[in-house]
Amino acid sequence: AAYYRAMDEYLPKDIRHRFASFADDLACGADTLEELFSLYKALVECLFKAGIQVKASKVKYGVEEISFHNYTISKDFTRPKEENLLPIRNCAIPTSVTELKAFLGCTQQMSQYCQDYGIIAAPLHRLTRDKEPFPRPWLEGTDYDIAFHRIKTMMLDGTRFLWNKDSSKRLFIEVDACNEGRGACAYQYADDPPHGEEDEGRYRLRSKEPKRVVAWMSKAWSDHEKQLPVFYREALGRLLCLEAFRNLIETQDVEAGATVYTDHAPSTYAGSLSNKGRLSTWKI
């Protein structure tokens, strides 16, 4: 809390957003050493004014990659920290609900790196319910056994990484819902659209250019949500996915903006959410 107060009070407002903090760790980045030095100088002056001391031996300056919180961060990418993958790599078949919850806790921290994580993990979450008996013995080939091995394989895939979001480029979000749950992908493109293109969202609609994935999200439907009509689930899926990506959307430059894609054509018409009960309150 002391770090947050100090930075909010003593850092210049135009560079406050350049600093990230978690517990007692601070990090910032720049494209040039000169710019990085100016940020470092501002931070030292900020801590001095706040009366906060830091240990010089713990300072890293001018490096191309750092470990921060649960991640390894570079200029372009963010990937899971190797120390966080060790418990998953060493995890054997769970023999109790406690062990299963520990496994899910480790993997949930990195769910944004995996497509459909929330839907794949649904059989495992079901086993953590009070009224659901834990399988003894653990049976191979069951839905929960397949889910356990799929998640473990996904998490330990060495190619897992996410692109760092560029707030000056347009953000794209693809949302979809199925019978099992909803999911979304936030991504950007490396190249700018052609000069004079007014609607980048329409221009990129059928683009075959490589996408730079910024984050994945997914979640299985609850028993109640599974009973809702398809139109309701599609609308609810979009709403909840946008809520999950709210921070990504709100940190976009005003000129860059964001575009949301859905394959549910009926909901794209004007007034499609009117006069449909609770859907009217979800109208965006």
For every predicted segment, state its role.
Residues 1-40, 47, 113-117, 205-206, ...:
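Active-site palm subdomain of RNA-directed nucleic acid polymerases
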Residues 7, 23-26, 47, 54, ...:
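Mobile genetic element proteins and their domesticated derivatives, centered on retroelements
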Residues 239-284:
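RNase H catalytic domain
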Residues 1-2, 192-236, 264-268, 272-274:
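A short, polar/acidic, helix/strand-boundary loop motif
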Residues 17, 22, 60-163, 168:
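C-terminal reverse transcriptase regions that engage the nucleic-acid substrate
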Residues 2-12, 34-55, 85-96, 135-167, ...:
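Inter-domain linker/hinge segments that demarcate the starts of reverse transcriptase
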Residues 18-20, 25, 51-53, 58-60, ...:
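Beta-sheet entry/capping signal
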Residues 12-50, 67-79, 88-89, 189, ...:
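Catalytic palm subdomain of template-directed nucleic-acid polymerases
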